[in-house]
A protein has these predicted regions:
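Short alpha-helix boundary/capping motifs
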Residues: 17-21, 113, 153-154
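Short acidic/histidine-centered micro-motifs embedded in hydrophobic/aromatic stretches
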Residues: 9-12, 58, 88, 124, ...
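Substrate-recognition/cap regions that form aromatic- and gly/pro-loop-enriched pockets
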Residues: 58-61, 68-107, 113, 117
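C-terminal amphipathic alpha-helical interaction region
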Residues: 108, 116, 120-164
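Terminal peptide-recognition signature
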Residues: 1, 85, 125
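Amphipathic alpha-helical blocks and their helix-capping loop/short-beta junctions
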Residues: 2-77, 81
């Protein structure tokens, strides 16, 4: 659904709430080609590891423009946040239910917002707008498994997410 069609579609749904399926079908269009798909083989190869250090090593060793561009982008991001993201992806692939994932996501988010890198990211992008965050730890190697385990610690039952 193109963004330009939203006002018209909203008005049509408001006028005929029972016709949502037909309205959305009539307004839908094929998605444009995603340029990222042109790099699918590179992405699958370069990002195959479950560790950030190995992803960085693969990008550094590749020598291609795409790998160099991605490495440059990743080096501006919080090493802690990237390691948290990799762990969430890995753990999520093993979970049996959406509720289990939500429990973990909520606990992780609760811990992350209390840490330096979250506050530093807010400072660099929203407050000072200098886009020069000073991450701590500053490198993937400095983000220890112990630190990540602390971020993934379950919340006490009274604070944990529940589906109700």
């Amino acid at each position: 659904l193109p963004a330009s069609a939203l006002p018209e579609v909203k008005a049509a749904i408001a006028a005929d709430p029972h016709g949502i399926d037909a309205i959305l079908t009539a307004a839908s269009v094929a998605a444009p080609h995603a340029a990222l798909l042109d790099h699918r083989a590179d992405i699958d190869r370069l990002f195959a590891s479950d560790t950030l250090e190995e992803v960085f090593a693969a990008l550094e060793a590749d020598g291609g423009d795409f790998a160099a561009q991605q490495l440059a982008i990743l080096k501006t991001k919080s090493p802690q946040s990237m390691k948290v993201s990799l762990r969430l992806l890995y753990d999520g692939s093993l979970m049996q239910s959406f509720a289990d994932e939500m429990v973990q996501e909520y606990a992780v988010a609760t811990h992350v917002v209390q840490r330096h890198d979250f506050l530093e990211g807010v400072r660099a992008v929203i407050v000072d707008k200098d886009n020069s965050p000073r991450w701590n730890p500053a490198t993937p190697e400095a983000v220890t498994d112990h630190l990540i385990d602390q971020i993934f610690a379950p919340l006490p039952p009274a604070e944990a997410w529940t589906p109700n």
